[in-house]
Amino acid sequence: MAQKKKTKSAKAKPAKKAPAKKATKAKDIKYVYDFGKKTDGDAKQRELLGGKGANLAEMARIGLPVPPGFTISTEVCTYFYDNKKSYPKSLDAQIRQSVELMEKQLDKKLGDLEKPLLLSVRSGARDSMPGMMDTILNLGLNDQTVEALAKSSGNERFAWDCYRRFIQMYGDVVMGVQKLPSEDHDPFEEVIETFKAEIFPNAKGEVDDSKISASQMKELVHRFKSLVKKRSGKDFPICPWEQLEGSVGAVFGSWMNDRAIVYRRKYGIPAEWGTAVNVQAMVFGNTGKKSGSGVAFTRDPASGEKVLYGEFLTDAQGEDVVAGVRPPRPVAQLK
């Protein structure tokens, strides 16, 4: 009989496994987007950066002189409300890294006793919601850094004016020092008007805040801090990082304040969108009569005519324009 050839059975090769997808860890998620000399975002990212953050990034990207800063994304706002008003673990480190980048660009430092960096903290929803959420200016000031600002600017009154504005904004927005149902006026404004009546007893009509001297501003700061302590039971915070944390939380919190909710319902803006938070280096309009703040458009908003249109106030900060503290002047007068 013919012998059968022995055949070796080929062993089946194991199928190659598809490379496992790396799970995105919370620490890998980018929550903070810089703008300035280093810019992460652009105009297409309104959902993530909000309208203001996306536009700031786009302007910086095309080379316009945008003061440096960073945007905390709308994803953090969503996390904030989904997790009992807490933050992702990696957020603090990302914010500190972005602040350090600003410090290097400007040669200033948050809390520094020679060249302090001061910040603004603003909201930035996908669709504009003017005046509905909160803003804080001049963040970073305390009893020491205000002296440094006075020295570095050569303008003591300006420095103390910034400080009293910061205490008023932070006290209201973060610490809840607001008008009570039994009161007719904002408590900070009551303090200002009482103080002006003391120092200008013979004044006829309303006295403009610009008439208050540097030494008088110092006294006003003292009275503001006393008001904060009395109403909130807490001292005004002196640590700039504590101030920044409180301000960011307050801006996210303002997404759900009563006026923002009413506005969203009226204009069909979903609550799920959330708001971004924009942190930016301060530019000052209250250094004297040769500085100012205002609003400008490249076209007339009413007619669409291609003309520079807007209004401004001299020796003022942005909130003065919004609040209508005195009649603004048309931008056309600058020609």
Language model features: what each stretch is:
Residues 2-335:
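Nucleotide/phosphate-binding sheet-loop regions of phosphoryl- and nucleotidyl-transfer enzymes
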